[in-house]
């Protein structure tokens, strides 16, 4: 009986969501923040606007429940480990 009870406790602990939350870099400050519950994906969106030639691509960093949908002209990268979406500034040559 004790073995059965212990097995049930272990299975319950393994199956429960233990409240782990992902940390992602989030714009506008590109600081690491804890994502809201249910948002376990970090993303980086980049695109060109009218100032792209002088300022570089626009960057949006954040958390999401699923990887955002790809739109024409927008590059999206998604990952699922803590702080896996760092902002790398564009360097002019």
UniProtKB/Swiss-Prot annotation:
GO terms for cellular component: extracellular region. One of its GO terms (molecular function) is toxin activity. Pfam families: Toxin_cobra-type. SUPFAM superfamilies: Snake toxin-like (SSF57302). Expressed by the venom gland. Belongs to the three-finger toxin family. Long-chain subfamily. Type II alpha-neurotoxin sub-subfamily. Binds with high affinity to muscular (alpha-1/CHRNA1) and neuronal (alpha-7/CHRNA7) nicotinic acetylcholine receptor (nAChR) and inhibits acetylcholine from binding to the receptor, thereby impairing neuromuscular and neuronal transmission. This is Long neurotoxin LNTX-2 homolog. The lineage of its organism: Eukaryota, Metazoa, Chordata, Craniata, Vertebrata.
């Amino acid at each position: 009986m004790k073995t059965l009870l212990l097995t049930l406790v272990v299975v319950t602990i393994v199956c429960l969501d233990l409240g782990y939350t992902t940390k992602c870099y989030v714009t506008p400050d590109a600081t690491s923040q804890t994502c809201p519950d249910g948002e376990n994906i970090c993303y980086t969106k980049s695109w060109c606007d009218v100032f792209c030639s002088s300022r570089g691509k626009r960057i949006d960093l954040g958390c999401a429940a699923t990887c955002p949908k790809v739109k024409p002209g927008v590059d999206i990268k998604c990952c699922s480990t803590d702080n896996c979406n760092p902002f790398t500034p564009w360097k002019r040559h």
